[in-house]
């Protein structure tokens, strides 16, 4: 059974002005170092807090890559939760679960004309290798059973529900279109069935 290992106050956001806590866990299914960020304005005792499961994306979250919308989705969520509260589960599942180096290999194939899913498949991987079991374990460790989920991805909805988390509302993120990510977003909609208005 997963439990909170440590929790520490810190400030987040583009200007480091949003009060939050970062939590680590032990007892998760794998040895991945997933964390939760709880925004101070969040009341985790409320019936259904706002929750986003965000898979690590070094290229988008840190370097603001033009190839994806991950960094923008994270910033949008931080801003929203800074105002109204919520919980971000930051999951160490780089490249939809294929890892950073394999993702860079997939980028090379995308530069040659493949979409994000075709590139992963060409490298011998499935469309999406992420597993959200540990996200459900993290929520259970926090005593959260009902949530309002921030996502455009039906896989996240389905997997959380399969692990006993009740989703009372799905809140979609905006479409973050920029030069270089149009084909990526189109593939997410057509192939990944993401609920995204382009």
UniProtKB/Swiss-Prot annotation:
GO terms for cellular component: cytosol. Belongs to the GTP cyclohydrolase II family. It catalyses: GTP + 4 H2O = 2,5-diamino-6-hydroxy-4-(5-phosphoribosylamino)-pyrimidine + formate + 2 phosphate + 3 H(+). Pathway: Cofactor biosynthesis; riboflavin biosynthesis; 5-amino-6-(D-ribitylamino)uracil from GTP: step 1/4. This is GTP cyclohydrolase-2. It is an enzyme of class 3 (hydrolase). Zn(2+) binds at residues 57, 68, 70. The keyword Secreted does not apply. GO terms for biological process: riboflavin biosynthetic process. Binds 1 zinc ion per subunit. HAMAP family: RibA. GTP binds at residues 52-56, 73, 94-96, 116, 151, 156. Keywords: GTP-binding, Hydrolase, Metal-binding, Nucleotide-binding, Riboflavin biosynthesis, Zinc.
